[in-house]
Structures are given as C-alpha cells and as structure tokens.
From Swiss-Prot:
This is NADH-quinone oxidoreductase subunit I. It catalyses: a quinone + NADH + 5 H(+)(in) = a quinol + NAD(+) + 4 H(+)(out). It is found in: Cell inner membrane. It comes from Azorhizobium caulinodans (strain ATCC 43989 / DSM 5975 / JCM 20966 / LMG 6465 / NBRC 14845 / NCIMB 13405 / ORS 571). It is an enzyme of class 7 (translocase). Pfam families: Fer4_7.
C-alpha cells in the first residue's frame, strides 16, 4: 500500500489527472451567458417587480378588498380605500408597497380576486436610495402599463396550472 502511494506522489498522478480534466472542460462550449447583453428566458411564474393592472378600458382593477394587505407576511403593503362609488364599488386612494420589506413570496398575487396586483417580469430595478424602493399607486400603475403585454402572456401561459 505504501509503495502505491509513493508512486502516485512521485509521478504526480492527481495533478496530471486534474490538468486533463481542466483541459477537457476548457474546450467545451461555455455554460455562462454574456449578461447584460444576453438574458436567459424567465419562467411565466417568475416573481419580479410589482405592478397594478388595469382593465382594457383603462379603469384600475383593484377593488380595495385589502386581501393582499392582510396576507402579506412582511406587512409591506398599505392600502386605504376610498368611499363607495355610485355603482357600489370602491377603489383605493392609497396603495403603497415597501419593496425593502417585501420578500417576493407571491401571496399578494395569489390572494387578489381580480388579478390587480401582480409580480411582473422585471428583475432589474436597482436604485441608489431606499426611498426609491417605496412604491406608491402611481408607480405601480405605471409598471402595470409598461409590462401589461408580458404580464398577460405569463398569466395565460400559467392558466392551466391555476
């Protein structure tokens, strides 16, 4: 046994086998991508930046039921409902999400009965200050308008599994 170990140490077999292993992978195609110039496709269930959606007629979907606020484990959502309208519905006067607190669990999206709050496909929303990560209703509606096509496509792709 000791003679075998001495021969391996003398001829550096581990070093040579490691070198050949490295050379084998050196000439294979690379598994990485050139981010940010190339991006991997994301899943329809990806949970990124939050957005509030609108109906096709332009009216916001949120009915101020506050289910998302109640289910949020991080207590990152704050909603204030306005008075009831003539048709009996309500809308929010304030809808804030503190993205610093948010844990991107997706419970708010699952709890919403009208698919108003969604987590969109955008994952590149780094900021320089914490205040920029405090999203108000206007910012959330702007996100929804910007990403509506991708959000609708992701919801349609995920529909058989809901």
């Amino acid at each position: 046994m000791k003679l075998d170990q001495a021969a391996r140490a003398l001829f550096l077999t581990e070093l040579v086998s490691g070198f050949f292993l490295a050379m084998r992978y050196f000439f294979k195609p690379k598994a990485t991508i050139n981010y940010p110039f190339e991006k991997n496709p994301i899943s329809p269930r990806f949970r990124g930046e939050h957005a509030l959606r609108r109906y096709p007629n332009g009216e916001e979907r949120c009915i101020a039921c506050k289910l998302c606020e109640a289910i949020c484990p991080a207590q990152a959502i704050t909603i204030e409902a306005g008075p009831r309208r003539n048709d009996g519905t309500r809308r929010t006067t304030r809808y804030d999400i503190d993205m610093v607190k948010c844990i991107y669990c997706g419970f708010c999206q699952e709890a919403c009965p009208v698919d108003a709050i969604v987590e969109g496909p955008n994952f590149e929303f780094a900021t320089e200050t914490r205040e920029e990560l405090y999203y108000d209703k206007e910012k959330l509606l702007a996100n929804g308008d910007r990403w509506e096509r991708e959000i609708a496509r992701a919801i349609a792709a995920d529909a058989p599994y809901r």
